Amino acid sequence: MRGLAKLFFLSCSFVSLVSSEKTDESPTAVSDNYMPKATATIDPSVFALSNDFEITDVPTTREYTFDIAKAFASPDGYEREVYVVNNMFPGPVIEANTGDTIIVHVNNHLDEGQSLHWHGLRQLGTAFMDGVPGITQCPIPPGGSFTYNFTVSHQSGTYWWHSHYSNSMADGIWGPLIVHSPNEPLQRGRDYDEDRIVFITDWMHDNSEIIIAALATPEGYKGNIAPPQGDAILINGRGQTNCTATGSSSCFYPPPPEIQVPVNCRVRLRFISATAHPMYRISIDNHPMEVVEADGTAVYGPTVHEISVAPGERYSAIINTNEGKEGDAFWLRTSVALSCMFGAVSQEGLAVVRYTGNGMVSTEEPQTSAWSDLAGVTVPCTGLDQTYTLSPRDSLSAPREPLQSHFFNSERGAFVNVLGNTFQGYGFNNISYQNQIFNPLLSIVQRGGSCENTLVSSRTFPDFGPGNIIINNLDTVIDHPYHLHGNEFQVIGRGTGALSIDNLTNIDFTLDNPVRKDTLWIQGGSWAVLRITADNPGVWALHCHIGWHLTEGKLAVIVVQPSAIGHMESPESWTNLCANTDPNAFGPAKRSSSPSIQSSKTSSFQYLREVKGKVVKRRGAREA
């Protein structure tokens, strides 16, 4: 490695902040040239949150314009085409307060549909803004635009946004979303002095479409039917690949990202896992980390040397920068959790944590060593909430009796599509998700229809009140991170094997202030019981957050208060996204332009031929 260039914390000039005036929200053409024109901007310094941001309980409107396009970038030293927002890689940081309204005008300059999901935000009363094509909206077409408009209600903490169209998230469409509140249990100035984001992703040298297409064949991707672990690990948009393995003469070794922190301070590190596959274990040489947040919930947690973060999860930890003097540097290490992924190989991503003060910033690389007690290959693959007790600082006990309990049996197996072809894929309750991308389930329920069909596993919570979601991970050797949209859940029980309605009453559940999350790692051959409050009408996705598994059908939905959905009024711009499309087409289908210009010519038969029956219904029935 080379000496590190001096990095300065610059403001993000690529986010377009505009006045809160009414705009035309109908989808319109913005571009018909989909080839990359620019080199993406990679600036890790934008992940240092400024203490000048005003934390207040006075609501305001924060308005952005996001231009999604292609660009060239070499985030790990290997140049490839990437997807960018406002030419930034990763995309812009959104920072707001509880009660603020966030408006994001999205212009899609790609040659495929797109959507944005606001991971962890409940979308209370704004189910139409959740951003899942085929579930809560039609995709934003190539050359089209759409405006997301929602209020952040009763939430604060660490979140993120990302594409929910196929697995194009893995090509670069993601960024942090931080919500502050003067009433949150963790207060800047009292509990910590400085605030930094650590945005972690796996990174592939091939576009996601290439990988998805290969995984749908018997040969798999590069001879392996299992999804890849990544060619590199990126931290705040930068990493280092093995240039020898790439065979590229232009590959180079960029300096690792640098996280500058004042000496003798308490620094909050917000770890966001935007990975498409691996669980990562994170440590900082010489610095114990006090866990203080899990998925937006402030917690009392342990002080540890290493934190495990699964895809979609977020954890905050506080470190004390009193292990040296101004200019000293320490390695932040991010390693693949080898016991959590079949066939994984050792891989480490590095960042520099450097102490700053009033003098010049040193460029010397760290000479520090890793903790001697870091997890090895044989360490069980458990989530942080399994390994330690994480107690929410705002105490909330779970109701003793649920109104309803629904089972979701999750497994890989043989499925058959409508053409009669068999393939190996993923599903819930014997159904592998088949996405009618231009006929959103939310719209179907709004019109009085039902999601109970052979295209998606669906369960309904008709009334307001507590309910159980029981996930049985029947894949004995495959672990999965499960993410639930529109809801925060309490983890009231875990165990090995599988639960059924017969033995559910025999479990001693944790009801006294259990941890609250929205993404949960469940080991193969294990179960978890999630307690929700069915208070947010909508059709909400429940899916594996390994992006490659999601594209192979690992998605189900819960329908909350369908009668209330029938009285919800959808925005006109939302309805216009589905104009001139084929509701029987299966996604991710493409349109050549905005629906105001040209109607979709994609038929379900054409699409099924294209993907060779990748998403199908499973043979047989095996309901809980």
From Swiss-Prot:
Report domain Plastocyanin-like positions: 72-183, 195-343, 469-562
Induction, as annotated: Expressed during infection of host. Expression is repressed by glucose.
Highest taxon, organism lineage: Eukaryota
| Consequences of knocking out this gene | Decreases virulence in mice.
Q: Which family does it belong to?
A: Belongs to the multicopper oxidase family.
> Reaction(s) catalyzed by this protein?
4 hydroquinone + O2 = 4 benzosemiquinone + 2 H2O
Listed Low complexity bias regions: 592-604
For the ligand (Cu cation 1), the binding residues are 117, 483
Q: What is its EC number?
A: 1.10.3.2
A cellular-component GO term for this protein? extracellular region
Which species is listed as the source? Cryptococcus neoformans var. neoformans serotype D (strain B-3501A) (Filobasidiella neoformans)
Q: Which residues bind Cu cation 4?
A: 480, 544, 549
Q: Sorted alphabetically, which keywords does the UniProt record give?
A: Cell wall, Copper, Disulfide bond, Glycoprotein, Metal-binding, Oxidoreductase, Repeat, Secreted, Signal
Name where it mostly resides: secreted
Q: Record's Pfam families? A: Cu-oxidase, Cu-oxidase_2, Cu-oxidase_3
Binding residues for Cu cation 3: 164, 485, 543
Q: Which GO terms describe its molecular function?
A: copper ion binding; hydroquinone:oxygen oxidoreductase activity
Which Cys residues form disulphide pairs?
138-578
Identify which cofactors the protein needs according to its UniProt entry.
Answer: Cu cation
Protein name in the entry: Laccase-1
